[in-house]
Swiss-Prot record:
Pfam families: Ribosomal_S17. It is found in: Plastid, Chloroplast. Part of the 30S ribosomal subunit. The gene is RPS17. GO terms for cellular component: chloroplast; chloroplast envelope; chloroplast stroma; chloroplast thylakoid; mitochondrion; plastid small ribosomal subunit. This is Small ribosomal subunit protein uS17c. GO terms for biological process: plastid translation. Keywords: Chloroplast, Plastid, Ribonucleoprotein, Ribosomal protein, RNA-binding, rRNA-binding, Transit peptide. The keyword tRNA-binding does not apply.
Amino acid sequence: MITSSLTSSLQALKLSSPFAHGSTPLSSLSKPNSFPNHRMPALVPVIRAMKTMQGRVVCATSDKTVAVEVVRLAPHPKYKRRVRMKKKYQAHDPDNQFKVGDVVRLEKSRPISKTKSFVALPVIARAARKAEAGGDELLGLPLESQQPA
């Protein structure tokens, strides 16, 4: 009688050792949730780390492919001075619109081939961007030289 009550209490506790049975039961491996499952808010900002880069086209002889050289500043491993590091990327140019010397924006995409996983997009020039944004007039006021006398 004492043995049966002891056995039933041990079964209720479900004491098991991985050494005794060869493996741990899957029910004990599942992590308990200490917090309730909350849904994420709808307006979560998308993190886009190193998915876009800017570079200059150095080779455009292949069909629908351009080689783009991206220059970045990185600390030298020994001297800790920031040096220019160059790297060439193969990018997809579906319309063959870019020529050597064009400045393009590389955007990460699905792998297109073994070496191509970026798409080349045109970059709006800085002067055109300022003119488009109305950079000549500060706060909507004309410059002093543009005012009538």
